Regions:
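N-terminal secretory signal peptides that target proteins for export/translocation
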Residues: 1-10
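Bacterial N-terminal signal peptides
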Residues: 13-24
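Short, hydrophobic/amphipathic alpha-helical patches that form generic packing surfaces
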Residues: 21, 151-160
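Residue-level preference for alpha-helix termini and adjacent loops
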Residues: 24, 73-76, 147
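N-terminal signal peptide c-region/cleavage motif recognized by signal peptidases
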Residues: 26-28
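Acidic, serine/threonine-rich low-complexity disordered tracts
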Residues: 31-119, 163-285
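Internal, conserved structured core segments that host functional sites
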Residues: 108-152
């Protein structure tokens, strides 16, 4: 979601909190809404970054764009800014990714990814710089780029049916994600209901989901951060509704780390009727 260059939080910008949906969906839903959200990132209770996320969701298409920057001590020692964007079509109420782009700059180094996606298959992609060669890295094969979505589109989760969006069913989904460097699954399950009150915008119930991370390709299995994330049982994503649609998106993400919880939480969460399409930097490659 929001690009902040930290190992754990970045994985969930591009991951979890990065969350795609292979849940059963029913019937098209009218969708004309724009979400204007702002987030703050914390590590062990200390503010380390801020970001913004704008989504324009319509009957037949959507765009989403995010930006973020490091703050406080993290900015002093490492700095870091980033942008990411996605666009695609809406089919039977379900977002279908067509293009994704992300750029993260930290410590004078730039990381760039662009994806072109057609019918759930990555047709072309560029990654700069390439991932370092390592004999232990699981190679990304052609099949790893099929039946997937990008990290940002994965965060736009449609709830099927006509019932209440804020229900346990919102969590019952699994996501197949390719971010240009790694292919992984995120499996979600219902944990509990809660309530939130943003400084601006949404006040009301959220659905809290447990998330389990399973890397499939592009990673090094012996790397400590990968082993740590695979073993985690306490990753949470709090889902809030985008008024005017049957879409829910992350309001809060929490990932335990050895130095305290890494948390990304909305301070502003304002949904309004859609107007002009939101420009993004994601383009067809």
């Amino acid at each position: 979601m929001l690009p902040i260059r930290l190992r754990l939080p970045r994985l969930f910008q591009s991951t979890l909190v990065s969350l795609s949906l292979v849940a059963g969906l029913s019937g098209p839903a009218l969708a004309q809404a724009k979400l204007d959200a702002k987030y703050t990132a914390y590590l062990g209770g200390v503010t380390i970054g801020r970001g913004a996320w704008v989504i324009d969701y319509r009957d037949d298409q959507y765009t989403a764009a995010a930006s973020g920057m490091a703050t406080g001590l993290l900015k002093m020692f490492a700095g870091g800014t980033g942008t990411s964007a996605s666009r695609g079509s809406v089919s039977n109420g379900q977002p279908v990714s067509r293009a994704y782009a992300a750029t993260i700059t930290a410590s004078k180094k730039k990381d760039e990814v662009e994806l072109a996606i057609e019918n759930g298959a990555v047709k072309d992609y560029t990654v700069k710089p390439p991932s370092p060669e390592d004999p232990e890295r699981i190679p990304i094969k052609e099949n790893d780029r099929k039946g997937v979505t990008d990290p940002m589109t994965a965060s736009l989760m449609r709830v099927g049916g006509n019932g209440d969006l804020m229900a346990p069913e919102a969590c019952q989904r699994s996501s197949a994600i390719f971010d240009g460097r790694m292919r992984y699954d995120l499996k979600m399950s219902f944990k509990r209901m809660d309530k939130v009150k943003a400084e601006k915008g949404y006040q009301g119930p959220v659905v809290v989901c447990a998330v389990h991370f399973t890397p499939l390709a592009g990673h090094i299995p012996t790397r400590p951060v990968i082993k740590y994330l695979v073993a985690l049982q306490d990753i949470e994503v709090w889902l809030a509704p985008v008024t005017g649609t049957r879409i829910v998106v992350p309001y809060r993400i929490s990932v335990p780390t050895p130095v305290g919880d890494a948390v990304l939480e909305a301070t502003q969460f304002i949904a309004s009727p859609a107007s002009k399409a939101t420009p993004t930097s994601a383009k067809a490659l």
